[in-house]
Every structure is written in C-alpha cells, then in structure tokens.
Amino acid sequence: MKNIAKLKKIKGDASFREFYRNKDKNSIYVISKKEKIKNLLIYDAINKILIKNKILAPKLISENYLNNYIEIQYFGDQTLYEIIKNKKNNKFKTFKKIVKILNKMQLIQDKKIKNFKNKFYKVHEYKNKILFDEAKLFCDWYVPKMLPKVKIIKFRKKFKSEIKNLLSTLNYKNDTFVHRDFHVSNLMYQNKKIAVIDSQDALIGNKAYDLASLIDDVRLKTSNKLKEKVFKFYIKTNKKIELNKFKRDFELLSILRNLKIIGIFMRLALRDNK
C-alpha cells in the first residue's frame, strides 16, 4: 500500500473500518484491524457472489490480510441516497431500478464461494436467534437510558417474550440471499449503473427483509405514498408472493430492524463515542 498520508481518507460508516482512496488506480483501501475476517475476507467473498450473478459490486484488486487491508474497485462518491434526497420529482423511477436489482439479488442460489485465501466461505442462515439478538440491542442500550432502574428488569422480560412470540409467527422460510443493509446509502451510482456495497453481513434469510430495509430506511425521509408505491411495484414483479403473509413478515421485520438500529445508534454514542 502507498504511504497512507498520500491517500485521501473517505468518510466511513458505523463500523471500525477505515477507507482510503487511491486516485492513481481509482481504487479504495479498506483497512480493518477489528473484525477483519468479516470486513475483509467475508466482504470479498460476498462481492464475488454478487459479481458472479451479474450484480455490480467491488472487485478485489489486491489484498494484504496480514497487514489488515484489501484494495477494491471504487465506484465514485455518489450514493443513491444523495440522488433521491435531492430529487424533487419522480423518485419512484429510481426506486423501481433499485427493486429490479433486489429482485436479481434474490435469485442468487450460490451459498458457497472461495475467498482470496482460496478457502470456501459458506453464507450462513439468518436464524431467528440472530434476529432476536439484534432486536435485543434496543433493550440493552436504549431502554436503560429511558427507563428508571426499577422498571428495566420487568420491561426486558416482557420485551424478550414478545419478540420471541413474534419471531415464531414469521411465514417465509430462510431461503433467500439477504444483504441485511440494503438501503440507498449502500447503493452507488456511476455511469448510469448502480453498484451494491457494504455486503459483508449477507445471510440466507427471509425474502421480506431487504425490502423492509429499503422502504423503511430511517436515514431517508419518504412519503407513505411513495413507500406504498415501491411495495406494490415489488409485489407486481414477484407474482408468486402471497400478499398477506408477505406483508406481515415485511412489517414485523421492519419493526425488528428499526429496534436494532435504535440500539446500535445508542451503542455507538455511549460505547464508541461516534
């Protein structure tokens, strides 16, 4: 890697990764000293699966796992978040393009691929235990700041019981490729093409999850009318879906995801000073 001082640092996300742009090669260095298996090895493996299935994702240019970094393809600095946020009219047209990419992603059958260490990585299942632990972040980090101590124990017990009951009512099986963070800030726009980034957390899970991530995105304010149009377009392009069952899963997973996000944001503030 070049002298890091000569590289342009790019604004990161909520993770412990750092990103530096190499203008000479139009690439990005992803540096990860913590969770490097997920942030480097698994990230590359998932990108390979996406690319294999003709979905635009960062190609690996070089790697130095020993020194905690990989170099990947750069898709510019324009996200679909910025495009949609600044668009006064016809936001739905952009969302239709995104839904088509989601549909393509949900057709992925590959669950195993070799990473850059030439070892097979298998995409794991998005089990209810993971969904439960994610929702529990709300209880662990947000609730203690909002309730007096005497009420926390009772609330936690009731909360956990309710979440477990709700999870048991999910209709759709875990049989679909799930990005797990599929929203407009993780979709890059370059040369009239959309690229998918930040896919290291992908699992095989419920078909409704990524649509819930996209439509009920806490970072992007959209009207209920637009949300409904995007949902209906997805249903229209997925004829085999049982609407009532799917909508119930969509609503439940959206609630669970947003409980997780509230917990994560509070943890970032309290534990990580971000």
Predicted region positions:
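A glycine-centered beta->alpha junction motif in the catalytic cores
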Residues: L66, I72-K87, F120, L137-K149, ...
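A short beta-turn/loop motif at secondary-structure boundaries
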Residues: I10-A14, S62-Y65, F250-S254
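Active-site acidic catalytic loop and adjacent metal/ATP-binding pocket
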Residues: R17-K23, M105-Q106, I163-L211, V218-K225
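ATP-binding pocket architecture of kinase catalytic cores
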Residues: Y20-D133, N171
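Active-site activation/catalytic loop segments of kinase-like enzymes and analogous catalytic loops
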Residues: K136-M146, K207-I241, I255-N273
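An alpha-helical support segment within catalytic cores of ATP-dependent transferases
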Residues: M1, D110, Y121-K122, K129-I130, ...
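Acidic, serine/threonine- and proline-rich low-complexity regulatory regions
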Residues: I241-E251
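ATP-binding glycine-rich phosphate-binding loop
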Residues: I4-R21
